[in-house]
């Protein structure tokens, strides 16, 4: 009798498992079913289990249940890999000539910083690069094609920085180009990656792209009148990492940015130039910043940028971070003493055909 009860219990258990499998094989409404190949593999495994049960097998039938999952897994593995989805087509075809790169500097850094940029990334992109400084330098004009003396103060003050940004904005509008990109004199710009990024967005739409340096919106006080203040908060892309603005958006900024308006707008919130850009775009115009981790400033730990990903970055930087030297961590033909910024090593990685780059170097 015990043997008969055990047989009934076993058959009941196998029958329940079979029913569960049938339920699993039925595609619920609103959910995608198995791929054709997977469904075929699952069906074959299920048929094997059904055949074993029909043949009156007991314990072997239980092994068939486990075998079903093995067969289903094999069916999944044997399916050809799905082809990678095609890359998103560019919104429009642009060339470096469509981009206006403004490099903000000061006369005391013409040799210490600008010479490095002129030897590296600017050397291949002179027509699209415009250097905004605060003093005359005939030697610099011989090396760079577009040098603009803003006649702004050389001080690193809110007013001086906003003065230069105002000139940058006006010169961009005059240029008729599609994209305005601002960087500092301690940035390396990978122009190929920059152009590829910008081509993903129509320049006629409202595009503001860069990286914030804060983990929350900045809070400021907007001066409405002599005695009335209004709190505002907004995101802004830090100028130290670089940022880009489409022409469509730049034109909308005109009432608050063109002519002398940019400086008066900056005074209204009493914040520096990059914050003022964010204020106009996010707080006044209601356009959101598009964050991109491809922009980098010296305010972040640059050692965390993988060497294998350097060619994908838009901007890099160097400086000090937590009282330590902060630059891209990579090997190259130049020692850290010879190339403390690592910009020369990065440039040779991206452009090994550069005449001064050593050949046969593993980066």
Curated annotation (Swiss-Prot):
Manganese is the most effective. Can also use cobalt with lower efficiency. Has some activity with magnesium and calcium, but not zinc. Mn(2+) binds at residues 186, 298. A soluble form may be derived from the membrane form by proteolytic processing. Glycans are attached at residue 151. Pfam families: Fringe. Its EC number is 2.4.1.222. Disulfide bonds join 152-163, 181-244, 348-357. Residues 1-8 are cytoplasmic. Residues 30-363 are lumenal. The keyword Glycoprotein applies. It catalyses: 3-O-(alpha-L-fucosyl)-L-threonyl-[EGF-like domain protein] + UDP-N-acetyl-alpha-D-glucosamine = 3-O-(N-acetyl-beta-D-glucosaminyl-(1->3)-alpha-L-fucosyl)-L-threonyl-[EGF-like domain protein] + UDP + H(+); 3-O-(alpha-L-fucosyl)-L-seryl-[EGF-like domain protein] + UDP-N-acetyl-alpha-D-glucosamine = 3-O-(N-acetyl-beta-D-glucosaminyl-(1->3)-alpha-L-fucosyl)-L-seryl-[EGF-like domain protein] + UDP + H(+). The active site is at residue 274. GO terms for biological process: compartment pattern specification; negative regulation of Notch signaling pathway involved in somitogenesis; ovarian follicle development; positive regulation of meiotic cell cycle; positive regulation of Notch signaling pathway; regulation of Notch signaling pathway; regulation of somitogenesis; somitogenesis. Glycosyltransferase that initiates the elongation of O-linked fucose residues attached to EGF-like repeats in the extracellular domain of Notch molecules. Essential mediator of somite segmentation and patterning. Belongs to the glycosyltransferase 31 family. This is Beta-1,3-N-acetylglucosaminyltransferase lunatic fringe. It comes from Gallus gallus (Chicken).
């Amino acid at each position: 009798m015990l043997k008969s009860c055990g047989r009934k219990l076993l058959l009941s258990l196998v029958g329940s498992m079979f029913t569960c499998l049938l339920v699993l094989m039925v595609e619920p409404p609103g959910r995608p079913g198995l791929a054709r190949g997977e469904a075929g593999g699952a069906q074959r495994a299920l048929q094997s289990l059904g055949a074993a049960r029909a043949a009156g097998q007991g314990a072997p039938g239980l092994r068939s249940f486990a075998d079903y999952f093995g067969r289903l897994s094999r069916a999944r593995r044997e399916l050809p890999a799905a082809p990678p989805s095609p890359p998103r087509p560019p919104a429009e075809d642009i060339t470096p000539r469509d981009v206006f790169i403004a490099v903000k500097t000061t006369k005391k850094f013409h040799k210490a910083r600008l010479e490095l940029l002129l030897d590296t990334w600017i050397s291949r992109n002179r027509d699209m690069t415009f250097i905004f400084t605060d003093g005359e330098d005939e030697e610099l004009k011989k090396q760079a094609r577009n040098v603009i003396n803003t006649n702004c103060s050389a001080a690193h003050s809110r007013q001086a920085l906003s003065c230069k940004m105002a000139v940058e904005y006006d010169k961009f509008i005059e240029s008729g180009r599609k994209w305005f990109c601002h960087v500092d004199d301690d940035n390396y710009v990978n122009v190929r990656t920059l152009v590829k990024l910008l081509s993903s967005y129509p320049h006629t739409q409202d595009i503001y792209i860069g990286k914030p340096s804060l983990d929350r919106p900045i809070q400021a006080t907007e001066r409405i009148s002599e005695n009335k203040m209004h709190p505002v908060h907004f995101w802004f892309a830090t100028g130290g990492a670089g940022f880009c603005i489409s022409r469509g958006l730049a034109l909308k900024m005109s009432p608050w940015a063109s002519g002398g308006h940019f400086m008066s707008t900056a005074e209204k919130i009493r914040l520096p130039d990059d914050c003022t850009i964010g204020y106009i775009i996010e707080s006044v115009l209601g356009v959101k910043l598009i964050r991109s981790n491809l922009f980098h400033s010296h305010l972040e730990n640059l050692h965390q940028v993988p060497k294998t990903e350097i060619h994908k970055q838009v901007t890099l930087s160097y400086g000090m971070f937590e009282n330590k030297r902060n630059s891209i961590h990579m090997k190259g033909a130049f020692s850290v003493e010879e190339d403390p910024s690592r910009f020369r090593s990065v440039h040779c990685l991206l452009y090994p055909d550069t005449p001064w780059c050593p050949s046969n170097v593993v980066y």
